[in-house]
Amino acid sequence: MNPEYDYLFKLLLIGDSGVGKSCLLLRFADDTYTESYISTIGVDFKIRTIELDGKTIKLQIWDTAGQERFRTITSSYYRGAHGIIVVYDVTDQESFNNVKQWLQEIDRYASENVNKLLVGNKCDLTTKKVVDYTTAKEFADSLGIPFLETSAKNATNVEQAFMTMAAEIKKRMGPGATSGGSEKSNVNIQSTPVKSSGGGCC
């Protein structure tokens, strides 16, 4: 095993163009934020190493383009992903409505037991908010996936979103697994300490 880390998890950020996927990645990986919006061309990725339960986990986070014309490129990145974060913009109802389509993409291209996380970004824009926290939470609960509202601008829940995803993947893989794709399904069901029931910024 590589001495630098115990696990290597590949994460994927998907969602409509302009919802803030790149901003979330920049905030988590580099702790920076930019107001200027430049559309991701194809795929970009960053790496950050975290500590979780005494283990060193290397996160390889892929940021995908939300535009339709890149869909064929990005579909290949679903394969091999351990976790997929579906992002929508809380000020854009259509981006939330399209979450169902993104989830269908996951079902079509990703491995069957991939971990999913729903994220409502831009929760700092309270006066422009159109997607209610409760609506999104109930939707996520009905699918059995965790949900958080985040703000890449204010760094609200960004760290927690990625840590939640890492913890969920680690829990699914079981104690003896490395990132070699061990498809263990005998997961112990236990409370996840990093999962928040509240949005924290609604």
Curated annotation (Swiss-Prot):
<feature type="lipid moiety-binding region" description="S-geranylgeranyl cysteine">
    <location>
        <position position="202"/>
    </location>
</feature>
<dbReference type="Pfam" id="PF00071">
    <property type="entry name" value="Ras"/>
</dbReference>
<keyword id="KW-0449">Lipoprotein</keyword>
<dbReference type="InterPro" id="IPR001806">
    <property type="entry name" value="Small_GTPase"/>
</dbReference>
<feature type="binding site">
    <location>
        <begin position="63"/>
        <end position="67"/>
    </location>
    <ligand>
        <name>GTP</name>
    </ligand>
</feature>
<dbReference type="InterPro" id="IPR005225">
    <property type="entry name" value="Small_GTP-bd"/>
</dbReference>
<dbReference type="InterPro" id="IPR050227">
    <property type="entry name" value="Rab"/>
</dbReference>
<feature type="compositionally biased region" description="Polar residues">
    <location>
        <begin position="180"/>
        <end position="195"/>
    </location>
</feature>
<feature type="binding site">
    <location>
        <begin position="121"/>
        <end position="124"/>
    </location>
    <ligand>
        <name>GTP</name>
    </ligand>
</feature>
<comment type="function">
    <text>Protein transport. Probably involved in vesicular traffic.</text>
</comment>
<dbReference type="GO" id="GO:0015031">
    <property type="term" value="P:protein transport"/>
</dbReference>
<keyword id="KW-0653">Protein transport</keyword>
<dbReference type="GO" id="GO:0003924">
    <property type="term" value="F:GTPase activity"/>
</dbReference>
<feature type="region of interest" description="Disordered">
    <location>
        <begin position="173"/>
        <end position="202"/>
    </location>
</feature>
<keyword id="KW-1003">Cell membrane</keyword>
<feature type="binding site">
    <location>
        <begin position="15"/>
        <end position="23"/>
    </location>
    <ligand>
        <name>GTP</name>
    </ligand>
</feature>
<feature type="short sequence motif" description="Effector region">
    <location>
        <begin position="37"/>
        <end position="45"/>
    </location>
</feature>
<keyword id="KW-0813">Transport</keyword>
<keyword id="KW-0547">Nucleotide-binding</keyword>
<keyword id="KW-0636">Prenylation</keyword>
<feature type="binding site">
    <location>
        <begin position="151"/>
        <end position="153"/>
    </location>
    <ligand>
        <name>GTP</name>
    </ligand>
</feature>
<comment type="similarity">
    <text>Belongs to the small GTPase superfamily. Rab family.</text>
</comment>
<feature type="binding site">
    <location>
        <begin position="33"/>
        <end position="40"/>
    </location>
    <ligand>
        <name>GTP</name>
    </ligand>
</feature>
<keyword id="KW-0342">GTP-binding</keyword>
<dbReference type="InterPro" id="IPR027417">
    <property type="entry name" value="P-loop_NTPase"/>
</dbReference>
<feature type="lipid moiety-binding region" description="S-geranylgeranyl cysteine">
    <location>
        <position position="201"/>
    </location>
</feature>
<dbReference type="GO" id="GO:0005886">
    <property type="term" value="C:plasma membrane"/>
</dbReference>
<protein>
    <recommendedName>
        <fullName>Ras-related protein ORAB-1</fullName>
    </recommendedName>
</protein>
<dbReference type="GO" id="GO:0005525">
    <property type="term" value="F:GTP binding"/>
</dbReference>
<keyword id="KW-0472">Membrane</keyword>
